[in-house]
């Protein structure tokens, strides 16, 4: 099939630089003179009418490029002959004598996705064996036109192009707080299809789909309806993109298993993993996959199965011990494979990180199951690929744009990861690549910045053997994404990526939000002042101010994707506030309001008020940007962090105005535990404390952080439970700390609190409890964990004095005073639960090393 644009005119203008993404495999400039469209130019094609969208898209694109009219279209039934005597193949052979045309003509990727484009004399001719190939040829034609200064000219070229990897795609995390709107997902699909991406995975659909039988799953989180997915799937299909769910079938179920009604299906309450010894899970999975199959009509289905860390720890332990964990996994994978196949899916994908460890799994997996190998380092060689290849399993490699838990993607690192992993995958026979984006810790970063790394992967995935010229790539990307060739765009990207590359913020990218949301006046120590690094922040602020101005100007003139310019400006504003915050925090470490004159006091107050205004403006803009690309579900969680920060500044203003003494903003309760003798096993610890009450109570609240599953009782009354564990998933993070109203359970005289804490992570089972009992007299009695609490392995004792890691921010990071009146728990760091999780994973002999590391983290204020 073909598309021909005729009646072009040869100009006297000379060739301009051609910028294409992905770069074609075979490209030759055959004449320096540019061609231009004339009033008589038209389109002739034998495309099936069902694929007329391809021509419609081209017509819309040339309108954006400045064409005043649509080109007339004539559909014909037979191939149109080129005006010159040479055939298409003859022209190609003449210009690319090194190409083996027999191999080329029978290349499966060429047949399914390849195209030939010739612009010569008075015609542009695109030929392909498939509609998808024609579509890709049109995308290249659009870029050829966009590469010229007027957007209406085209270089005279011969292009032979087809992908070396059949599958080139992305996985988009919509499950961890920032659920993209359908319109935003369509934007991503349309944009990425222009760069010849053909797979789009939605992560994770087991808890982001509105299952009819389980209406509580995904509720309040932006879960997608059948109608939304059906609409999105049809849109993707039209753009030659496969829309595929990543549906976890064993691990990453903690968002669901956090709910009490689903505990029976997991290893334990809040478990990461399903109980594979319970046959009822297969009924649930079968029903859910059936629902998905009604709208996800691709032949591909991704069953996840990565990071299933809890398998064999709880409910399935006896079963797993009996048959061996490798065989247990294999039986489960085969059951899932059979279920998925029964719903019409032909190609099933599974993550590699668990299965590759067990030879019986590698030997026993169905040989058509595709293994997705993911790795986010920058190494050039990946021996595990060779190991998987030995068992003749198809492989897809999956690098990352490395945007998780940071303000701005780590471009330098991700470009190496994408280039090296895809190249090594190609060398080991991979059939494709899927580049991932992750929204760890509530997905605070605006999703629009994912697009650049995704586009980079399209370049590498098309031809992994070709070395990417980064300057030319970014020049091409910015031109085709924003529609103009303006060096200021390049400057914005270069300056923002240099913030990380040159360590201008003096912190690791993954610690940025920890410092951003930490209490600005957290400590009163000279060492703390020393640890707040602000060197050359004045220069960085100046750079960010410059970027903000540039972005404001660019927003007015870019013809496409203006919203992405606004996001880049927001990043600059965010960094600027971060710098101002740290400068102010450092300045006020030694500040004593009682010793300064009124004039200086006013200066300090004005500085804090300026920070408040800056932060408030930042929050307002953040909300606008969020709602322009994502559903409102999930935003309140992050907004609350900004509001806490504003409250901290309000309190500092009040403290300064009143010339009050500095007050430690962290709750005084300590992180306590019994001992470290039960590491690497599930164990239970009981904690108890007796409190005396001699007056009438106005209100009484208890805030509890468990480790990992804590039941709270007061005077033998069950109050509730809290699941506190390390997770990247939204529901767990939202509920790691719980507040309980305990007034009705208290009595005059002695009251006994008992915490039954079960640590399923193999850690040391630490807890932190802070409570306030307000008495009618106006007095407040505090409940706080410390070394006056007792602990035991059994409910009946023997009871021992507990051990303590001290009060926040030690180990947990900062924990400010909760707002009990409004049921808002302490603002916690993303790192709060990491320590106990690490204890459960590292060898027991290294426990003391971890304790030293945590002490150093505290000493150097890495955790605030």
Language-model-derived ranges and their functions:
Residues 691-694, 698-713, 752-757, 799:
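Aromatic-lined ligand-binding clefts that engage carbohydrates, nucleic acids, or primary amines
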């Amino acid at each position: 099939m073909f598309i021909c644009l005729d009646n072009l005119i040869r100009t006297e203008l000379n060739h301009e630089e051609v910028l294409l993404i992905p770069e074609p495999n075979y490209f030759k400039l055959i004449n320096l003179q540019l061609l231009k469209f004339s009033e008589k130019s038209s389109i002739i094609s034998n495309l099936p009418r069902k694929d007329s969208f391809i021509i419609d898209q081209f017509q819309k694109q040339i309108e954006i490029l400045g064409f005043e009219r649509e080109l007339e279209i004539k559909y014909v039934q037979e191939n149109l002959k080129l005006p010159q005597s040479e055939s298409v193949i003859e022209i190609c052979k003449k210009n690319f004598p090194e190409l083996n045309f027999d191999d080329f003509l029978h290349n499966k990727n060429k047949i399914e996705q390849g195209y030939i484009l010739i612009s010569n004399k008075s015609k542009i001719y695109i030929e392909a064996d498939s509609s998808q190939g024609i579509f890709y040829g049109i995308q290249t034609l659009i870029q050829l036109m966009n590469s010229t200064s007027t957007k209406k000219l085209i270089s005279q070229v011969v292009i032979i192009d087809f992908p070396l990897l059949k599958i080139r795609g992305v996985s988009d995390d919509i499950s961890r707080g920032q659920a993209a709107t359908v319109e935003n997902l369509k934007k991503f699909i349309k944009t990425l299809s222009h760069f010849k991406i053909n797979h789009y995975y939605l992560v994770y659909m087991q808890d982001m789909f509105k299952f009819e039988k389980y209406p509580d799953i995904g509720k309040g989180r932006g879960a997608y309806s059948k109608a939304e997915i059906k609409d999105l799937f049809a849109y993707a299909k039209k753009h030659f993109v496969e829309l595929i769910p990543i549906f976890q079938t064993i691990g990453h179920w903690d968002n669901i298993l956090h709910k009490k009604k689903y505990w029976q299906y997991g290893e334990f309450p809040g478990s990461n993993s399903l109980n594979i010894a319970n046959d009822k899970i297969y009924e649930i999975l079968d029903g859910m996959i059936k629902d998905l199959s009604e709208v996800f009509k691709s032949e591909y289905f991704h069953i996840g199965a990565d990071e299933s860390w809890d398998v064999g720890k709880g409910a399935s332990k006896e079963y797993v011990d009996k048959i061996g964990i490798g065989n247990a996994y294999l039986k489960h994978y085969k059951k899932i494979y059979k279920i998925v196949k029964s719903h019409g899916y032909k190609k099933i994908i599974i993550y590699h990180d668990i299965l590759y460890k067990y030879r019986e799994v590698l030997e026993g997996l169905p040989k058509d199951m595709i293994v997705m190998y993911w790795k986010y380092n920058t190494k050039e060689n990946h021996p595990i690929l060779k190991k998987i290849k030995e068992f003749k399993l198809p492989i897809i490699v999956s690098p990352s744009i490395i945007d998780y838990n940071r303000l701005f993607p780590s471009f330098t690192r991700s470009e190496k990861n994408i280039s090296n992993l895809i190249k090594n995958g190609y060398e080991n026979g991979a059939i494709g690549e899927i580049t991932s984006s992750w929204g760890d810790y509530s997905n605070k970063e605006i999703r629009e910045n994912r697009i650049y790394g995704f586009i980079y992967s399209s370049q590498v995935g098309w031809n992994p053997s070709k070395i990417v010229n980064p300057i030319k790539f970014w020049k091409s990307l910015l031109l085709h994404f924003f529609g103009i060739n303006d060096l200021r765009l390049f400057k914005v990207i270069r300056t923002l990526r240099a913030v990380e590359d040159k360590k201008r913020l003096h912190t690791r990218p993954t610690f940025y939000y920890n410092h951003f949301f930490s209490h600005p006046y957290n400590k009163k120590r000279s060492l703390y002042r020393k640890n707040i690094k602000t060197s050359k922040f004045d220069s960085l602020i100046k750079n960010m101010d410059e970027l903000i101005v540039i972005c404001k100007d660019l927003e007015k003139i870019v013809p496409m994707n203006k919203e992405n310019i606004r996001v880049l400006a927001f990043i600059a504003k965010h960094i600027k506030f971060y710098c101002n915050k740290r400068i102010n925090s450092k300045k006020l470490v030694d500040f004593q309001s009682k010793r300064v004159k009124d004039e200086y006091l006013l200066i300090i107050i004005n500085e804090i008020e300026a920070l408040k205004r800056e932060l408030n403006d930042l929050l307002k803009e953040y909300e606008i940007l969020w709602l322009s690309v994502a559903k409102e579900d999930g935003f309140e969680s992050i907004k609350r962090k900004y509001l806490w920060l504003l409250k901290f500044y309000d309190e500092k203003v009040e403290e300064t105005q009143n010339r009050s003494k500095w007050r430690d903003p962290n709750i005084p309760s300590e992180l306590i535990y019994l001992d470290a003798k039960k590491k690497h096993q599930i164990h239970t610890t009981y904690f108890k404390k007796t409190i005396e009450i001699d007056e009438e109570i106005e209100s009484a609240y208890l805030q509890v952080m468990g480790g990992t599953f804590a039941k709270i009782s007061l005077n033998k009354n069950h109050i509730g439970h809290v699941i506190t564990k390390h997770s990247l998933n939204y529901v767990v993070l939202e509920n790691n700390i719980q507040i309980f109203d305990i007034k009705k359970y208290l009595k005059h005289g002695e009251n006994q609190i008992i915490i039954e804490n079960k640590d399923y992570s193999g850690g040391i089972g630490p807890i932190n409890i802070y409570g306030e009992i307000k008495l009618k007299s106006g007095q407040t009695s505090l409940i706080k964990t410390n070394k006056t609490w007792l602990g035991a392995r059994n409910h009946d004792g023997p009871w021992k004095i507990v051990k303590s890691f001290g009060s926040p921010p030690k180990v947990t990071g900062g924990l400010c005073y909760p707002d009990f009146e409004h049921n808002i728990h302490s603002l916690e760091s993303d790192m709060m639960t990491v320590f106990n999780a690490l204890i459960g994973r590292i060898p027991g002999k290294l426990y003391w090393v971890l304790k030293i590391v945590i002490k150093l983290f505290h000493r150097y204020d890495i955790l605030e």
